[in-house]
């Protein structure tokens, strides 16, 4: 906390100190109207360009804000063309907006910009005035519901876990499944490295023809973020503050028996009534404070911002403290021929991960057990366990309060980025660009389990008492790019040509130390093992390190954009890319794209339409997993009991490994008529030679793991975006927008005819896999036996699907897939929707975003393990849903535990008001109240109906490590998930 306050104080002094240079400002007011009929536009955005100063018009179309002479006002309204007006000597500025010119918008694409009407691929541009409102901590949430085909999932409320982002579903299997993030031209930057309040615009490149120019790193789509820049008015400095205070509570949990119900069901009575979930959860408080200053001098401008975030999770002790700082500097020289843009940022994040396993044990731990050992109904040596009660002799039973109070699980990450872009106008129509960027990401994690920890310190073991783990890693990335752009005009046509070179270099280093068997707790979490003597005091030591050689990506690229008669648009690009991750002979790939767009209304002249545009695009992108040394053999360090150090083969080499390639065809139709606009996208994507780490024959390869080109996938999808300015009256305006998307992915080829992935795990169901992967079938097929009742002995009965009179494996054996198994559901939704509503009533703004997913199922593993009333497990609590089957006393996976998980939820509701102030100290005050996850409509009995797009596995996850997400096994609701939270946040923003 001390370092947290120090950073905040430094930021405050730095930014407030700049205020002395600020020029005097005045109140600018006026009315924004429709240029056609003169009606007032309610809720129009009026922003001072390059600053955080802004307001919206009231019921009369009037506005008022503080600005200085030379400032540029940007006026925007849904369905109208933006206007920019320079502030002069007058204090009154009235603006009439023209309707319907949507295609004049500028869109950021790879290595340049285009007018929206010239784009021939699936690209969506969202400016600051269209972002979701309210206090938002994750930048991608600004886009939620704005971009069809963009899914943002937040399974659980873990503050240390980022949102899951998907563009058009499954874009790869073993490579990077999330879109490439580009921040101010810096490729691969982290979303955690940018504060949402620093973002000016976000452009989403969805299809292959748009992303091909970025090569392999753009194979899952691209999100281009443009941050705010400074004002270019000489001598002007603008200061702004944004703050948030929030509270989070648990949204939903698992229905279990109360202590009385547990005793009535025959549970072991230990004399207490403990609400374990209340013992380990809390109301999590959060706060955000941010300051920004921007200004200009001469031909230069700057913007500097800093913010601090302190977030508590709903699980006690979980949360983080984060500090962000960013500087943007822009200048021109040599008679404005040379443009220099420089950006740098730093992020530090101190994390307390806690142990989300405590939530699971809060569900299943005996509700009559005491928290402390001194309250035990029988003699109990509580000192041995740190004063806590423990259920000894039971499998998988640990006191959840002891877990979070005795053990430590923390981490720290520091990210540093800088990038510089130099542009030089060699001729009027020829520009040269040089870009340099570097990222340095350092992380450390620490886990400590004292000798008294029954959870992992093994307090009952005489051989191994106490445990500590230390992990450090460092990732470095360098980027050097040079490209030139030439623009020529001939007659009614324009031609833009871009060509360039890209060099990317990355490396990775990590160190791991594992020690245990402490003589006492003097070797603790705080000491951090500082001396060799500390190490000698531990009974055992394990050391491991990993260092990758420099991995390089080298590319040559070119693009041509042709516009004919301002109505026909042709775009083509070609990228030749090589990667050292692959072996000789397979390092280079060729990735082309081509697109054509036609402004049909230019020729059809349909008076009712402002826009009618058809476009078709095709693009090929390559893809590679993020880890280094894909084709090389990987060896690990082995520490012998005698102190010797050797190596062993961990993963076999594959010199024949080649590029994973994705070819995608996209057809788009754009329509706009007055206050209505719609975009329809149809796409077909083929992924061939997808890369996957698999289990292989030890006799052939010397080890059981190898990375291979494993098969082909095909995805077909449809996306629709609709927006309408529904109501516009003197005292109220209402704008609504809906995005719909659907897709299905089919396995066309695979190295095996079929396999079943996604292991259910212990206790008792280690041999049970649940997700079938079969050639010719959709990805996500939940597979298993059909529940058909209960026997007199309480065993489960399965349906004889094939009618041969034979049942699947007996109750004492693991289930094995045979003719009596069926597809029980699919883990991927049939379709998803987002519905955004923006209502202005007499100066108040209400923004509501609803989201839903339909057609998907989830394996409720909570029920599969803990719902049957096992007579041998009277010391564990039972899950107690309305779907429980009376008399069932065996835990066997079947269709009984596969549930439809359709849901419709209010994701975000923000009520805000702009309060015009003429105070010299504070101006343009905005106050907001936001609720997130306010309600969820679903019949799913688990904690969270959100689609589970990946599975982290148990012990037998198709050869995938337990901490590696398995894209081929969606649809499993894991028992170790962090429960979702409902959050209410008060926000305040003002300029001074």
Predicted segments with their positions:
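Short, small/polar-rich motifs associated with maturation and membrane association
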Residues: 1-333, 338-347, 355, 417-418, ...
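Membrane-spanning beta-strand positions in outer-membrane beta-barrel proteins
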Residues: 72, 118, 151, 236-240, ...
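Extended, hydrophobic alpha-helical segments in both membrane/secreted and soluble proteins
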Residues: 199, 325-327, 554-560, 568-576, ...
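Residues on the lipid-exposed face of transmembrane beta-strands in outer-membrane beta-barrel proteins
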Residues: 227, 258, 291-295, 325-331, ...
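Surface-exposed loop/interface segments of Gram-negative outer-membrane beta-barrel transport/assembly proteins
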Residues: 232-273, 314-315, 328-415, 433-554, ...
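Transmembrane beta-strand segments that form the barrel wall of outer-membrane beta-barrel proteins
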Residues: 243, 306-312, 570-582, 616-618
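Short secondary-structure subsegments characteristic of cysteine-rich extracellular domains
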Residues: 320-332, 587-595, 925-936
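C-terminal substrate/ligand-recognition segments
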Residues: 830-855, 897-916
